[in-house]
Design a protein with these regions (language model features):
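Catalytic Walker B motif of ABC-type/P-loop ATPase nucleotide-binding domains
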Residues: 158-161
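Conserved ABC transporter NBD signature motif
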Residues: 60-71, 75-76
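ABC transporter nucleotide-binding domain
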Residues: 176-264
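Conserved ABC ATPase "signature" region
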Residues: 100, 104, 111-129
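Conserved ABC ATPase signature
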Residues: 133-137
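Conserved catalytic motifs of ABC-family nucleotide-binding domains
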Residues: 154
């Protein structure tokens, strides 16, 4: 499988001496749904800016589907659709004109531009707003408009910088469904987000960047398995005592008849069952509670 994005030794030092990127390497395979996570100031936006030729790199190389941004910039840019974090279109243009005019920058005929504009506006539930000035749209509609604009020339690589910031939960999930659909049709997607649930739900692979360096770069499933502890939820037959303590284990009473127990991966719950039995508590069922990406994110940044 070919590489949609290949970054080698990428550095960026700003005029004030701040080193935003410290020689990072990053590869994204064609067809992947890839998450780039990191705290504010970690280097995410700088990386995206360089990929899209909005920021000038200090050193290193960037290729998009084999096209170097140094020697084949025009070809590289044709492969990319970018959905920036901030709204960056005219407040007075209509939804229709914003999408159709964007297609013109990539050499599409008017007829083809209009066909694609209709397709994406319908898919993103904006067709009824096509003659509306962008300033009249809600924040969620503006987000969807930016996605339609980014897709109208049908790039093979879509980059989304915080695409659901400020979007309500229902709309966010509908956007997730749309992004999954276009990824399944073959579009490679790179996502930056502060909603860790978003990355966990959508992405197959993930890189975590911190202080201009890659702290982790692996499959999402592999990353989640790296958590050192597992949490189990125990349901009990009788109400639990007001206070309950089990030596050597971290416990948390979440309901009258529900107890969470954390232990090292591979550890045994036998001692927990024995301790509860001694306190007159019978366990009726047990389930593993999935560790969330937030925990791992904090853990990795602490290590780096």
């Amino acid at each position: 499988m070919s590489k949609a994005l290949e970054i080698r030794g990428l550095r960026k030092v700003y005029d004030n001496g701040f080193e935003a990127l410290k020689g990072i390497d990053l590869c994204v395979e064609e067809g992947d749904f890839f998450a780039l996570l990191g705290p504010n100031g970690a280097g995410k936006s700088t990386t995206i800016g360089i990929i899209c030729s909005l920021v000038k790199k200090t050193a290193g190389s960037v290729s998009v589907f084999g096209h170097s941004i140094d020697s084949e910039l025009a070809l590289a840019k044709k492969e990319i659709g970018i959905v920036p974090q901030e709204f960056n279109f005219s407040n007075f243009e209509s939804v229709w004109d914003i999408v159709v005019n964007q297609a013109g920058y990539y050499g599409l005929t008017r007829e083809l531009a209009e066909q694609r504009a209709e397709t994406y506006l319908r898919q993103l539930d904006l067709w009824e707003k096509r003659n509306t000035a962008s300033r009249m749209l809600s924040g969620g509609m503006k987000r969807r408009l930016m996605i339609a604009r980014a897709l109208v020339h049908e790039p093979r690589l879509l980059i989304l910088d915080e695409p659901t910031a400020g979007v309500d939960i229902e709309l966010r999930r509908s956007m997730w469904a749309f992004l999954k659909e276009i990824n399944q049709r073959g579009t490679t997607i790179i996502l930056t987000t502060h909603y860790l649930e978003e990355a966990e739900s959508l992405c197959r692979n993930i890189a975590i960047i911190d202080s201009g360096e890659i702290a982790e770069n692996t499959a999402m499933k592999t990353l989640l398995k790296q958590l050192h502890r597992e949490t189990f939820v125990l349901d009990t037959k009788e109400p639990l005592p007001d206070t309950i303590s089990i030596a050597g284990f971290e416990t948390h009473k979440t309901d009258e008849q529900m107890l969470e127990v954390a232990l090292e991966k591979g550890g045994s719950l036998n001692a927990v069952f024995a301790a509860l039995s001694e306190q007159g508590v019978e366990v009726t069922s047990m389930r593993n509670k999935a560790n969330r990406l937030e925990e791992l994110f904090v853990s990795l940044l602490a290590k780096s």
